[in-house]
A protein has these predicted regions:
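Intrinsically disordered, low-complexity Ser/Thr/Pro/Gly-rich regulatory segments
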Residues: 1-81, 86-189
Length: 189
């Protein structure tokens, strides 16, 4: 096989991967838009599970995706319920977990995800963002470094915050709402 033929095969593989992702995107989008007019909360939970499945396919295995959890900080600040929490379960244990009730320390949280359908209540999303911003990591907590652990003063950053992600079906999201989030994922019909 000559070099040109080898390059063509590689390009074909990359094209197949791209097509598979486009197919997956279409399938996920169709699932997200399936309506269940009988019971709204059921549909919301269903959509959260779909978004969680998407993140589960792309995140490293060290992360756990929890649905319907609360974040707590060392000053006893507690968030409102968060649709999806992406956390490092190996780093910090749960504060409390029993059945579906989960309280997760802010230090373990890598990302928080707000899942919305086609109607977004701007006021509640702003409150959600403000609640997340209020939570603080403990100054004396153990900090992760690339492959080491440190406690106490070092040349590292003193605090982190979770990445904020909005997953929605609504295509008309205001700039004000977008500013609350680091990433916005919109499903297209």
């Amino acid at each position: 096989m000559d070099e040109k033929e080898s390059d063509n095969r590689k390009l074909k593989v990359v094209e197949n991967i791209r097509e598979n992702y486009q197919s997956l995107e279409g399938m996920i989008s169709k699932q997200l838009f399936m309506g269940n007019e009988l019971h709204g909360p059921t549909t919301g939970s269903f959509r959260e599970e779909i978004w969680a499945g998407l993140f589960g396919q792309i995140l490293p295995k060290k992360f756990v995706i929890e649905q319907s959890a609360f974040i707590i900080d060392s000053e006893e600040g507690i968030s409102k319920e968060i649709d999806l929490v992406i956390m490092d379960e190996m780093y910090t244990p749960y504060i409390f977990r029993y059945g579906k009730l989960k309280f997760i320390p802010i230090e373990a949280v890598a990302a928080v995800v707000e899942c919305k359908s086609q109607s977004i209540d701007e006021r509640s999303v702003k409150e959600w963002g403000a609640e997340i911003k209020k939570l603080r990591t403990a100054k004396e907590s153990v900090a992760r470094l690339a492959n080491m652990i440190t406690k106490g003063p070092t040349g590292t950053q003193l605090s982190t915050r979770p990445i904020r992600i909005l997953c929605a079906l609504d295509q008309n999201i205001s700039a004000e709402i977008k500013e609350i989030f680091d990433f916005v994922l919109l499903a297209a019909k």
